[in-house]
Swiss-Prot record:
It comes from the Bacteria. It comes from Salmonella typhi. Residues 1-16 form the signal peptide. This is UPF0257 lipoprotein YnfC. Belongs to the UPF0257 family.
Length: 236
């Protein structure tokens, strides 16, 4: 076989040598739910997933699991925060998410399957023209969310009567490594913490294994917490 033909075939097998396919953008639902329920957003035809946050001692600190329809709606979402002994399990039912155990209506939806309101807490969400949640308003607070051109969350600003808390993320310059980032937290103009994360990725540019360092700068000296994140993702 001639070398040029061999190279051409290799390029076809590898999905293009110099022009690889760009990863998919984040859907409005995935990006918005990750903001509200505090997990790393995923892209592509995700069928189900789990994210497990583990301390440097190897203990599970938090776990998130979810199943999605082919249209990208969350059919189920379950969260367990072992450090704070809290949890939540939601199941989709028409225009609501119900508590998976009590079947109580918890979250009201808008559009296809986007967040609209949390009646028990008096919280309502507003979306932009693309369907991304850009603000949440409650009785004594308002949260504003920011995204990049591919729908990745860039941070949020929470305003209440006492102060303003802002989180701002700076992403990797590699568009396939969105979960490699640094983020800074501020209360008013005072920096109180920072986060650094780096990951290994699969063919869909989703994180498989991540290393997370959280630095609490509100205390002196600052305290660092090291975690690993294990992701399991199944696709359609």
């Amino acid at each position: 076989m001639k070398k040029p033909l061999l190279l051409t075939l290799l390029c076809m097998i590898l999905a293009g040598c110099d022009n690889p396919k760009s990863p998919e953008s984040f859907t409005p639902e995935m990006a918005s739910f990750s903001n509200e329920f505090d997990f790393d957003p995923l892209r592509g035809p995700v069928k189900d997933f789990s994210q497990t946050l583990m301390s440097e001692n190897g203990e599970v600190a938090k776990q998130v699991t979810g199943t999605l329809s082919q249209e990208g709606c969350f059919d189920t979402l379950e969260l367990h925060d072992l450090e704070n002994n809290t949890g939540l399990a939601l199941v989709l039912d028409a225009n609501y998410y119900r508590d998976a155990q009590t079947l109580e209506k918890k979250v009201q939806l808008q559009g296809k399957c986007q967040l609209a309101a949390l009646p028990s807490a008096g919280v309502t969400w507003e979306t932009d023209d693309n369907g991304f949640v850009v603000s949440a308003t409650g009785k004594e607070m308002k949260v504003e969310y920011r995204y990049d051109s591919e729908g990745y969350p860039l941070g949020k600003t929470t305003i209440n009567s006492q102060n303003t808390l802002s989180v701002t993320a700076k992403l990797s310059t590699d568009s396939r490594k969105k979960l490699d980032y640094t983020a800074v937290s501020r209360v008013d103009d005072r920096q109180v913490g920072n986060v650094t994360q780096s990951c290994e990725y699969d063919a869909y540019a989703n994180p498989v294994d991540c290393r997370l360092v959280i630095v609490d700068e509100s205390v002196k000296p600052a305290v660092s917490h090291h975690y690993t994140i294990k992701n399991r993702i199944d696709y359609y």
